[in-house]
């Protein structure tokens, strides 16, 4: 290294050569904090809300990092705390993994706090432990920020660290119900993530947009609490917060914010009759049900609509149970004889039952609309593009309409509304409408399996149902006339098409029958010389002209005879005709014996 020096005596500049080595430029690290923690959370339990599993992963990750970096905290017997310092992130031996240690420590403390939050519903004392763990997470987050603010990290890492620290402090203050400071921290994190996402490429912006949207419910809840909840225009916002699962004590919140409104809702007017509403839970539910339509109008996705309706159905179930408990306490209301006027409480129960069935029907119609996004109807020319999801078959839609018809049948059987002719006619017309849709999709199912005649019959029945439904009185809550008209116009064209296919199928079957009979003959040529037929097999190497080996023919064989009579036949004796042993002539052996003197015992 060459250094220029001024000589104080002469004033000349002299060059001095040093033997010190040239300093290497320090490394600059880039840590994608949000991307890293989101990947870890999705892979280790938070996809299913399992914070305990994620906390265990963080502990194992910290242990592996310290072991790999040879930076333990003491030995097996003694613990000696060793925090990460800037020395490990600068110089020749700088390693980016050192910055992961405080980050994973903060994530571990946060995961433990969220686990305690789930358990604090049944054990309130755990909230103290929860707050302590969040404080610990904030401590590690500040330690992370102190390291990231050095020159060892680039601007993106510093921005991500700032947003992460603000979010962690906002979460702590949110649990401490310090609404003003919580809102400030969360808003700061939201602004940083939003601006950071705009500066990144398009393929990386989606993660930051999702994170920005996560702050919106908490910020609105903080703003609501800061304003004291006096604004009645934010009731629908609170209900949307409930749909997103942010509020755990919605019943207490709604009872505090809707006191004045619930006092005005002492009676309901339904189908020309006023009924007093006494249970507090029912009043709160009715207010929520009134605001549901506004929330559904703001929502465009079918999944979000279904979730909102299902939450209202759960509240409706609790309200119905409250009314039934009140009926059980009054012996006069337990039984209702035929012809007797329905009491106010029982009429209220009928009204709540109607809300439950109508909202269930609305939920099922949302399921139908969701299924139609991935269904291709060959009869509708106006249908543009089918979704990329799983292909929906016509029998799936027919099954959904079958469930809807069961729901309509339950609506007809609501206690207290059997004698209401107007109501019964509306529900009956609704049932006919859904029967038309069901027959239409069953016909499409039959067309897929080439049953043209049955499809024509079901098209005709669907057309009759649709025409009858259009003539009847429609329900004010379910306007399905436009869909019925589309179905009728589609049936008018496809019915004749299916009929034509059925006629063609009959003609083809007759022609194919005669053709197959003539073509399936296997007689050789010499047996069918009087018949003309273009037989391509005669031009092959093995033409069917004459069969040299005759076919085997069955012939009668010798019958099997079982001679059972021989068992009982007594044959005459032949002993008298046999030659006796004494008369048998002497053999040559006896002659030799006698001649030689041995064997003759008679001379002795």
From Swiss-Prot:
Among its keywords, does the record have Endoplasmic reticulum? yes
The UniProt similarity line reads:
Belongs to the SRP68 family.
Positions of region (Disordered): 1-21
Task: Spell out the protein name for this chain.
Answer: Signal recognition particle subunit SRP68
> Main localization of the protein?
cytoplasm
Assembly mode: Heterodimer with Srp72. Srp68/Srp72 heterodimer formation is stabilized by the presence of 7SL RNA. Component of a signal recognition particle (SRP) complex that consists of a 7SL RNA molecule of 300 nucleotides and six protein subunits: Srp72, Srp68, Srp54, Srp19, Srp14 and Srp9.
Q: Name one GO cellular component term.
A: nucleolus
Q: Name one Pfam family in it.
A: SRP68
Please describe what this protein does: Component of the signal recognition particle (SRP) complex, a ribonucleoprotein complex that mediates the cotranslational targeting of secretory and membrane proteins to the endoplasmic reticulum (ER). The SRP complex interacts with the signal sequence in nascent secretory and membrane proteins and directs them to the membrane of the ER. The SRP complex targets the ribosome-nascent chain complex to the SRP receptor (SR), which is anchored in the ER, where SR compaction and GTPase rearrangement drive cotranslational protein translocation into the ER.
Q: Which GO terms describe its biological process?
A: SRP-dependent cotranslational protein targeting to membrane
Question: Where does this one sit in the cell?
Answer: Cytoplasm; Nucleus, Nucleolus; Endoplasmic reticulum
Q: Which UniProt keywords apply?
A: Cytoplasm, Endoplasmic reticulum, Nucleus, Ribonucleoprotein, RNA-binding, Signal recognition particle
- Give this protein's Gene Ontology molecular function annotations: 7S RNA binding; endoplasmic reticulum signal peptide binding; signal recognition particle binding
The biased composition feature labelled Polar residues covers: 1-12
Q: Which domain of life is it from?
A: Eukaryota
